[in-house]
């Protein structure tokens, strides 16, 4: 039994009130479970008050649009106004995406890096408000330093992997290739020591929380962008198709939800409906099959990006692999005595489309939960009707990871061109040893 003394007035005596621990717990649980319970300022716990105060300082997403668009749509209801705005900027982004694809792999890699930096800035700005409130030293500088270090490591890994032969031929860059991982580790250790030296008494817990915040942000955006670039080098189709599937699912789920949505899907995103989720899923599978069939006809999209020693440059020409060579499939299983010619990649595209439509949206739900925790509408307002860059790429990062794992598990086979690149990086005597071993082994096999 716990006694709670309550003073009714300044001159009134103390009143002893006995409250059982179990009753108090039940009251707290019922209050927490009540969906319509709203805490008063006095009832709010310190953490809730802190989040409320923090939310006032965070950059809130807005629905601002260009004035010319506002004036043109002023007579429309808000629901249809938002529909038109989202539609216009969706098509603008699709056209921009097409132009970047036309620019080739280098344009895609630069765009990936820029998107990554912007996403990191949007996430870290929330933590930066915590830094400003508490006066924590060096938080923003350390965050950007760790971003630079992480990019040096991951992008360097890609450069060494795909451009190692070219870089090794430049004398002053050879050192960076040979000791890339050691240099990356040394740069990280500098940041680590910098963080330790910046620790301030009273704020240890908060500083370590923000240190973790930065590293989780790096895990979300830098690691995923590294995987995206690996997917690009496997062939543009492994980048374009999954990205387009997420876009298609997002658009079609919005369309089906807008016209037919009645049943709420998840509390984290009240506007999401089962009708939109299911309709978007079917549309994505159909779109994935048709879009994949079109891209499979062009070497530009299906060939992996490799360095050609003969041509002395990176190439996107190849003999199409089994995945992109039409195969004959019998339809007897379905009671039809005919055959169908299909690219094997189409079957893989169905797996990708199912993931993008069933699991992909959970990347968006995760982001919605994060935004609700800090009581913000969007990560930013860079794209009218859509929010910030992170609001558009929350599902893309999850999809990129799946595609990378899918390729390494079910698709990737040893690449002769990549093996040659690694051999060219060896010393002449090591290359000669490999040559002799191959010669002897092949001789034994042929005799």
Curated annotation (Swiss-Prot):
- Name the residues that span the membrane: 88-108, 147-167, 180-200, 203-223, 227-247, 276-296, 350-370
- Which residues does this entry mark as bearing Phosphoserine? 30, 34-35, 40
**What is any Pfam family matched here?**
CTP_transf_1
Bilayer topology reads: Multi-pass membrane protein
Q: Which GO terms describe its biological process?
A: CDP-diacylglycerol biosynthetic process; G protein-coupled opsin signaling pathway; lipid biosynthetic process; negative regulation of triglyceride biosynthetic process; phototransduction; positive regulation of phosphatidylinositol biosynthetic process; regulation of lipid storage; sperm individualization
Stored PROSITE patterns: CDS (PS01315)
Locations listed in the record: Endoplasmic reticulum membrane
Q: Where is this region: Disordered?
A: 1-49
**Pathway named in the protein's UniProt entry:** Phospholipid metabolism; CDP-diacylglycerol biosynthesis; CDP-diacylglycerol from sn-glycerol 3-phosphate: step 3/3
As recorded in UniProt, its EC number(s) are: 2.7.7.41
UniProt enzyme class: transferase
Alphabetical keyword list? Endoplasmic reticulum, Lipid biosynthesis, Lipid metabolism, Membrane, Nucleotidyltransferase, Phospholipid biosynthesis, Phospholipid metabolism, Phosphoprotein, Sensory transduction, Transferase, Transmembrane, Transmembrane helix, Vision
Q: Which GO terms describe its molecular function?
A: phosphatidate cytidylyltransferase activity
Q: In which tissues is it expressed?
A: Retina. Localized to the photoreceptor neurons, both in the compound eyes and ocelli.
Q: Would you tell me the Gene Ontology cellular component terms?
A: endoplasmic reticulum membrane
Q: Tell me, according to the record, the phenotype of the null mutant.
A: Lethal during the late embryonic to early larval stages. Hypomorphic mutants are viable but male adults are sterile, whereas female adults remain fertile. Impairs spermatid individualization showing abnormal mitochondria morphology and defects in lipid compositions and lipid-mediated signaling. RNAi-mediated knockdown results in low insulin pathway activity and defective cell growth in certain tissues. Various non-adipose tissues display excessive fat accumulation such as the salivary glands, proventriculus, hind gut, Malpighian tubules and trachea.
Q: Which reaction does it catalyse?
A: a 1,2-diacyl-sn-glycero-3-phosphate + CTP + H(+) = a CDP-1,2-diacyl-sn-glycerol + diphosphate
Protein's job: Catalyzes the conversion of phosphatidic acid (PA) to CDP-diacylglycerol (CDP-DAG), an important precursor for the synthesis of phosphatidylinositol (PtdIns) and phosphatidylglycerol (PG). Required for the regeneration of the signaling molecule phosphatidylinositol 4,5-bisphosphate (PtdInsP2) from PA and maintenance of its steady supply during signaling thus playing an essential role during phospholipase C-mediated transduction.
Q: Which family does it belong to?
A: Belongs to the CDS family.
- Which protein are we looking at? Phosphatidate cytidylyltransferase, photoreceptor-specific
Q: Which organism is it from?
A: Drosophila melanogaster
Read off the lineage from the record. Answer: Eukaryota, Metazoa, Ecdysozoa, Arthropoda, Hexapoda
Q: What is the primary gene name for this protein?
A: Cds
């Amino acid at each position: 039994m716990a006694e709670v003394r309550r003073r009714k007035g300044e001159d009134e005596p103390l009143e002893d009130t006995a409250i059982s621990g179990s009753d108090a717990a039940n009251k707290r649980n019922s209050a927490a479970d009540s969906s319509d319970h709203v805490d008063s300022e006095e009832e709010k716990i310190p953490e809730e008050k802190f989040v409320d105060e923090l939310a006032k300082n965070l950059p809130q997403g807005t629905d601002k649009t260009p004035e010319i668009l506002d004036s043109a749509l002023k007579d429309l209801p808000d629901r249809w106004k938002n529909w038109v705005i989202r539609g216009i900027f969706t098509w603008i982004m699709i056209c921009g995406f097409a132009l970047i694809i036309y620019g080739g792999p280098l344009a895609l890699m630069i765009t990936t890096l820029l998107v990554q930096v912007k996403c990191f800035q949007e996430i870290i700005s929330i933590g930066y408000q915590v830094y400003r409130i508490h006066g924590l030293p060096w938080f923003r500088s350390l965050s950007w330093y760790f971003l630079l270090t992480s990019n040096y490591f991951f992008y360097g890994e890609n450069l060494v992997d795909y451009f190692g032969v070219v870089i090794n031929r430049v004398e002053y860059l050879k050192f960076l290739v040979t000791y890339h991982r050691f240099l990356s580790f040394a740069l990280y250790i500098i940041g680590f020591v910098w963080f330790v030296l910046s620790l301030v008494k009273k704020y240890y817990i908060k500083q370590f929380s923000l240190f973790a915040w930065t590293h989780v942000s790096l895990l979300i955006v830098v690691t995923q962008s590294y995987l995206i670039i690996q997917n690009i080098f496997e062939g543009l189709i492994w980048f374009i198709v999954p990205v387009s599937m997420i876009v298609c699912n997002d658009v079609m789920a919005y369309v089906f939800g807008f016209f037919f949505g009645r049943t709420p899907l998840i509390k984290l995103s009240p506007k999401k409906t089962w009708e939109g989720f299911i309709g978007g899923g079917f549309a994505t599978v159909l779109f994935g099959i048709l879009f994949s069939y079109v891209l499979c006809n062009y070497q530009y999209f299906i060939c992996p990006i490799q360095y050609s020693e003969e041509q002395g440059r990176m190439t996107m020409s190849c003999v199409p692999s089994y995945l992109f060579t039409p195969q004959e499939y019998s339809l007897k299983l379905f009671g039809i005595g005919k055959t169908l010619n299909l690219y094997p990649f189409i079957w893989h595209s169905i797996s990708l489309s199912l993931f993008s439509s069933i699991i992909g949206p959970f990347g968006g739900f995760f982001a919605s939960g994060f935004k609700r925790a800090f009581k913000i509408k969007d990560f930013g307002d860079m794209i009218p009707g859509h929010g910030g860059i992170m609001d558009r790429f929350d599902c893309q990062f999850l999809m990129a990871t799946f595609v990378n794992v899918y390729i390494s598990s079910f698709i990737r086979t040893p690449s002769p061109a990549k093996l040659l690149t690694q051999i060219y990086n060896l010393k002449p005597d090591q290359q000669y040893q490999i040559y002799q071993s191959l010669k002897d082994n092949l001789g034994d096999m042929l005799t």
